Design a protein with these regions (language model features):
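Glycine-rich S-adenosyl-L-methionine
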Residues: 39-67
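Tryptophan-centered motif/residue detector
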Residues: 11-13, 33, 41-42, 63
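C-terminal catalytic and target-recognition region of SAM-dependent MTase-like enzymes
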Residues: 6-22, 26-28, 34, 49, ...
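Canonical radical SAM enzyme core domain
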Residues: 4-7, 43
């Protein structure tokens, strides 16, 4: 497991491709409004456009880190197609090695879990028992040029006269 700014992998990535990446992208939080109504106050159309740009940037920055045959799980706590299906459709259209993998919707139980499947992923709708959100799985079908990994910093030897 690695922790770092996903938009700047050259700062922390060691060059070893990942077999799996989970990308929990920043979003409007439209799927959690029932429990966090203050989220609605912070949103605007401009904010949605900004978030879509961040989501695409994160997908584009992390995709080269994924090994051929690897999978990227994309999640948001939003139910808006503009942050989910449209972002993924735009990414897949521009990335020939990205292939959406079908996800089977969970069976609906007595708890009122409502889910809609699309070619891009699954949208879960908020209910009395659940928060809403989106999940999609992308499979990498071919190797693509990767980010140049960081180079280990050389330690400069310090002369005893410089140490004082």
């Amino acid at each position: 497991m690695r922790c770092g700014d996903a938009t700047q992998p050259e700062e922390w990535w060691d060059g070893q491709p990942f077999g799996a990446i989970m990308l929990d992208a920043p979003c409007t939080g439209s799927g959690i409004l029932r429990t966090r109504p203050e989220v609605k106050v912070r949103q605007s159309e401009n904010n949605l456009v900004l978030l879509q740009g961040q989501q695409l940037a994160l997908l584009r920055a992390t995709w080269p880190l994924l090994a051929e045959g690897g999978e990227l799980l994309y999640t948001t706590c939003s139910v808006l197609a503009g942050e989910n299906q449209r972002v993924l459709a735009e990414f897949v259209a521009g990335e020939s090695s990205a292939s959406p993998a079908a996800l089977a919707p969970p069976t609906q139980g007595d708890d009122g879990l409502a889910c809609a499947a699309s070619p891009e992923g699954l949208t879960f709708f908020p209910s009395a028992a659940h928060q809403g959100g989106f999940v999609a799985l992308l499979r990498k079908t071919a190797a693509v040029p990767t980010v140049t990994p960081r180079r280990p910093r050389r330690r400069r030897s310090v002369k005893s006269s410089e140490a004082l």
